[in-house]
């Protein structure tokens, strides 16, 4: 008797034509809410409309419909991204000096915007070299185009059109997968299939495609550009792809084709897949042959990873099994219950993803300058500073967003009945110990780190430099950081004998200069860095304290035991309970944003000053002339030094920018200060003040018989705070942007 295997049933995971396509709802603002669809009685309606329009949880409790809306919205987001990137490429094609920059990237600055002569605005068109007048850009697009092998504006045009085609495709997909073929809930919850497809498809095949592009297109074109060949003389990408003899002139192993691959003689390919380490001395960027090798290796890893999870074939990992097996001697039930959380709460899933992506973005910020991935990026100081600042802020917002969605998960989706004695439950049960210890750490770090600066300010004021903490008096050397630097210098000889140098000159060996400018060199760390790193530790710990307290106390606290019933955002625990304001999970996000801004301001200020003082500069016969002449070590060890020698001294360019091509930064600097100050109006005054004022103004309108039909109302407490923090951050970020760019474009 033969026992045959039961037939695998094909699951139908798509519902056909679930929702009719109709524009009728577009004409009904607030159609998703019974209250809002009635239309406005008071001005609060428009604020609630904005607050709830994308809060799909508030529209329906049907998880399948919520999932479909989120999925569809993702395609809309991708369409916006494709339109944006298409616009960037179009600007490069239509309004830029890309071809001129490509022929002389050392002396010509990138520009992709020319201002029309209206009311004298053409003053903004500065001379960027090569006879081109325009606004200098610091986005890094020219460098990434060079690394991709783009040699003409026609190629930028065609890529821009491709971006618009992709945007159209994404918009179609968003409509199709909501109205025509909408996935069922089971499809969204099939995590093993999702992992396989995302790992093997997006990351594996994505990296493989990029490695293929780098090898067949980018590297030969960049090899010729580095050798000084005129971009117009370089063969087109398809010629390198189709004509093996052409690329074999540059990389002889191409003559052998795939024979070395199948005979396992992989070292034959080492002419274009290298493991050099360090930076290319011609361009100041990573060796493109190293990055091609890296992407090929990443592709192999992720293609393997994309076959690890169990789907229809009964082999491989099962996420539920992995999570439930994950327990130690002190962790109770471990991760039991976590699978159910991540397959039924998209807020929990989003929180995890934002935390990981935010951390990764900050890691990217630190690698962009220390291991510049694109040619000539390292000597474009404005772009280096912009990319660091941009990635730091994006990472910070993602991490605060992670806390926000963790708290929303706790309030809306957490079911304590299913979470008994697992790690999450145990963390929540000893939250008092966690928060009080973290609070102690914040107090310790705050007093000690700030105290070191106050000591130095006092000693300098009293004329006692010998009693200061500095490299020339009482030294506080960052010995662990110096040990890590030294370890990385030694690493190639120990762990990677084939590599010719360490991952970056930052660690302590070699000076890379391009066109007489420092691309990268060893970054010495001393007492000044020790001091400011402890300020970083302090501000980061306070940010974490606020965000973590918000998450752990989002459902209940001693003060408000039934907090979960009040929701994610609420002003106070009702009338008659004084002292219960600003306790909602939303308020912790609100406060966390300010400390995130504090943390990152100090981090980007540290980076900006340190690089200008100790790294960036010109090579002269007498040695290296740094932009601020190495003043960081002695000036940044006092609060007064930060105020006088960094903020004030380096603000002179933006303050004096009027009448120059940088004058827009002067106006932005001024305007952003106003936006920031405007935020304080919302943050410092209570709702009652404004309601009284409004009622007085309404009285005057009634007198004149011009009273509005929609009753004016003061912003709610939560709305006022939201407007306040938005303007605080917008004003602060734009002020910093203008300050940094006017400075670095002037001196670089």
Curated annotation (Swiss-Prot):
One BP term from GO: photosynthesis
Entry binding sites for chlorophyll a': 673
Compartment annotation: Plastid, Chloroplast thylakoid membrane
Cofactor binding, note field: P700 is a chlorophyll a/chlorophyll a' dimer, A0 is one or more chlorophyll a, A1 is one or both phylloquinones and FX is a shared 4Fe-4S iron-sulfur center.
Gene Ontology CC terms, in alphabetical order: chloroplast thylakoid membrane; photosystem I
Record-listed phylloquinone binding positions: 690
Keywords: 4Fe-4S, Chlorophyll, Chloroplast, Chromophore, Electron transport, Iron, Iron-sulfur, Magnesium, Membrane, Metal-binding, Oxidoreductase, Photosynthesis, Photosystem I, Plastid, Thylakoid, Transmembrane, Transmembrane helix, Transport
Positions of [4Fe-4S] cluster binding: 572, 581
Pfam families in the cross-refs: PsaA_PsaB
Main location: plastid
Enzyme Commission identifier(s): 1.97.1.12
Reactions this protein catalyses: reduced [plastocyanin] + hnu + oxidized [2Fe-2S]-[ferredoxin] = oxidized [plastocyanin] + reduced [2Fe-2S]-[ferredoxin]
Membrane topology: Multi-pass membrane protein
GO MF annotations, alphabetized: 4 iron, 4 sulfur cluster binding; chlorophyll binding; electron transfer activity; magnesium ion binding; oxidoreductase activity
Residues reported to bind chlorophyll a: 681, 689
Residues that span the membrane, as ranges: 70-93, 156-179, 195-219, 291-309, 346-369, 385-411, 433-455, 530-548, 588-609, 662-684, 722-742
Broad class of enzyme this protein falls into: oxidoreductase
Keyword Iron-sulfur: yes
Quaternary structure note: The PsaA/B heterodimer binds the P700 chlorophyll special pair and subsequent electron acceptors. PSI consists of a core antenna complex that captures photons, and an electron transfer chain that converts photonic excitation into a charge separation. The eukaryotic PSI reaction center is composed of at least 11 subunits.
Cited function: PsaA and PsaB bind P700, the primary electron donor of photosystem I (PSI), as well as the electron acceptors A0, A1 and FX. PSI is a plastocyanin-ferredoxin oxidoreductase, converting photonic excitation into a charge separation, which transfers an electron from the donor P700 chlorophyll pair to the spectroscopically characterized acceptors A0, A1, FX, FA and FB in turn. Oxidized P700 is reduced on the lumenal side of the thylakoid membrane by plastocyanin.
Family to which this protein belongs: Belongs to the PsaA/PsaB family.
HAMAP family linked: PSI_PsaA
Name of the protein in its database record: Photosystem I P700 chlorophyll a apoprotein A1
Species: Chara vulgaris (Common stonewort)
């Amino acid at each position: 008797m033969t026992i045959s295997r039961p037939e695998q049933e094909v699951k139908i995971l798509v519902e056909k034509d679930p929702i009719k396509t109709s524009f009728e709802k577009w004409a009904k603002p607030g159609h998703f809410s019974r209250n809002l669809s009635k239309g406005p009685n008071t001005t609060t309606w428009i604020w609630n409309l904005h607050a709830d329009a994308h809060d799909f949880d508030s529209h329906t409790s049907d998880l399948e419909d919520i999932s479909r809306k989120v999925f569809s919205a993702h395609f809309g987001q991708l369409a916006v991204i494709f339109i944006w990137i298409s616009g960037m490429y179009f600007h490069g094609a239509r309004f830029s000096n890309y071809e001129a920059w490509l022929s002389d990237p050392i002396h010509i600055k990138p520009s992709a915007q020319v201002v029309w002569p209206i009311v004298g605005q053409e003053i903004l068109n500065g001379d960027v070299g090569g006879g081109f007048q325009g606004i200098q850009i610091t986005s890094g697009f020219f460098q990434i185009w060079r690394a991709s092998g783009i040699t003409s504006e026609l190629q930028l045009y065609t890529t821009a059109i491709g971006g618009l085609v992709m945007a159209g495709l994404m918009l179609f997909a968003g409509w199709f997968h909501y109205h025509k073929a909408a996935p069922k809930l089971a499809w969204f919850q099939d995590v093993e299939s999702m992992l396989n497809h995302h790992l093997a498809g997006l990351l594996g095949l994505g990296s493989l495609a990029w490695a293929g592009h780098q090898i067949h297109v980018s590297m030969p074109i960049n090899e010729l550009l580095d050798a000084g060949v005129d971009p117009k003389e370089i063969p087109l990408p398809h010629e390198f792809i189709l004509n093996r003899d052409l690329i074999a002139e540059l990389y002889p192993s191409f003559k052998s084709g795939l024979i070395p691959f199948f005979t396992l003689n992989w070292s034959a390919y080492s002419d274009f897949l290298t493991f050099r380490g360090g930076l290319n001395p011609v361009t100041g960027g990573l060796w493109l042959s190293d990055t091609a090798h890296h992407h090929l290796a990443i592709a192999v890893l992720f293609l393997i990873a994309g076959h690890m999870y169990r789907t229809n074939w009964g082999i491989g990992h099962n996420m539920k099994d992995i999570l439930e097996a994950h327990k130690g001697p002190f962790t109770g039930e471990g991760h039991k219950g976590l699978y159910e959380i991540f397959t039924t709460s998209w807020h929990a899933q989003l929180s995890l993803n934002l935390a990981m992506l935010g951390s990764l973005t900050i890691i990217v910020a630190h690698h962009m300058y220390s291991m510049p991935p694109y040619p000539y990026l390292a000597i474009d100081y404005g772009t280096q500073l912009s990319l660091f600042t941009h990635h730091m802020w994006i990472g910070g917002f993602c991490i605060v967003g992670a806390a926000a969605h963790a708290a929303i998960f706790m309030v809306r989706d957490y079911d304590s009945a299913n979470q008994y004695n697992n790690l999450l439950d145990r963390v929540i049960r000893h939250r008092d110990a966690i928060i009080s210890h973290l609070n102690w750490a914040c107090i310790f770090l705050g007093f000690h780190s700030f105290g070191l600066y106050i000591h130095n300010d006092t000693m300098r004021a009293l004329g006692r430099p010998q009693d200061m903490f500095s490299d020339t008096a009482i030294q506080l050397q960052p010995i662990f950081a110096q040990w890590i630097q030294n370890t990385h210098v030694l690493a190639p000889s120990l762990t990677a004998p084939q590599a010719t140098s360490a991952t970056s000159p930052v660690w302590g060996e070699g000076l890379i200069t391009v066109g007489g400018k420092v691309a990268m060199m060893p970054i010495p760390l001393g007492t000044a860095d020790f001091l400011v790193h402890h300020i970083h530790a302090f501000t980061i710990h306070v940010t974490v304290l606020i965000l973590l307290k918000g998450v752990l106390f989002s459902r209940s606290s001693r003060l408000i035991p039934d907090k979960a019933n009040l929701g994610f955002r609420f002003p106070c625990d009702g009338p008659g309970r004084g002292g219960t304001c600003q306790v909602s999970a939303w308020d912790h996000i609100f406060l966390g944003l300010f400390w995130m801004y504090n943390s990152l301001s100090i981090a980007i200020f540290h980076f900006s000053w340190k690089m200008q003082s100790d790294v960036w500069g010109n090579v002269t016969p007498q040695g290296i002339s740094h932009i601020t002449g190495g003043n960081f070590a002695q000036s940044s060890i006092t609060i007064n030094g930060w105020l006088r020698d960094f903020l004030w001294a380096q603000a002179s360019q933006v303050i004096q920018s009027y009448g120059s091509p940088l004058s827009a930064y002067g106006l932005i600097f001024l305007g952003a200060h106003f936006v920031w100050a405007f935020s304080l109006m919302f943050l410092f005054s209570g709702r009652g003040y404004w309601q009284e004022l409004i009622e007085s103004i309404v009285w005057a309108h009634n007198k004149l018989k011009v009273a509005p039909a929609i009753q004016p109302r003061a912003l709610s407490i939560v709305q006022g705070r939201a407007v306040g923090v938005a303007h605080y951050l917008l004003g602060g970020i734009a002020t910093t942007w203008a300050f940094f760019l006017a400075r670095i474009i002037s001196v670089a």
